[in-house]
Amino acid sequence: MVLSAEEKALVVGLCGKISGHCDALGGEALDRLFASFGQTRTYFSHFDLSPGSADVKRHGGKVLSAIGEAAKHIDSMDQALSKLSDLHAYNLRVDPGNFQLLSHCIQAVLAAHFPADFTPQCQAAWDKFLAAVSAVLTSKYR
């Protein structure tokens, strides 16, 4: 999936605002995921899944940090996310459909926290970007 220069700028620009708040925002996205799509909890049976828990915030921070890395290497995401792709495909065996569910939750959190920045154009860019990240993470499932 090719993002235009404008779309890349929108993604990278918002990533700059997210970077200092990865745990809180990522945790909120996971809280939304677990509340809305209960089947996703099965991958985290070893976590305290109560809303706002340290486990959820810590993992949410890892998720948003990885997304930040993908944004930094937006033209070479395959290489930047290769180890993460291996982990999800070979070890964790996460259902690929869950990435799309999480993408929606991430966008809801971004819209709630950055309403002035998360314009329709920005949302479209983020939707496209997160679909590309999901495609990379599921590319080794075959």
From Swiss-Prot:
InterPro entries: Globin, Globin-like_sf, Globin/Proto, Hemoglobin_a-typ, Hemoglobin_oxygen_transport, Hemoglobin_pi
Keyword flag Metal-binding: yes
A molecular function GO annotation: iron ion binding
Entry keyword set: Heme, Iron, Metal-binding, Oxygen transport, Transport
Binding site for O2: 59
Any one cellular-component term (Gene Ontology): hemoglobin complex
Tissue: Red blood cells.
Domain Globin: residue ranges: 2-142
GO biological process: hydrogen peroxide catabolic process
Binding site for heme b: 88
Keyword DNA repair tagged: no
Quaternary organization: Heterotetramer of two alpha chains and two beta chains.
Protein family according to the UniProt entry: Belongs to the globin family.
General function of this protein: Involved in oxygen transport from the lung to the various peripheral tissues.
Record's protein name: Hemoglobin larval subunit alpha
Organism: Pleurodeles waltl (Iberian ribbed newt)
Lineage of producing organism: Eukaryota, Metazoa, Chordata, Craniata, Vertebrata
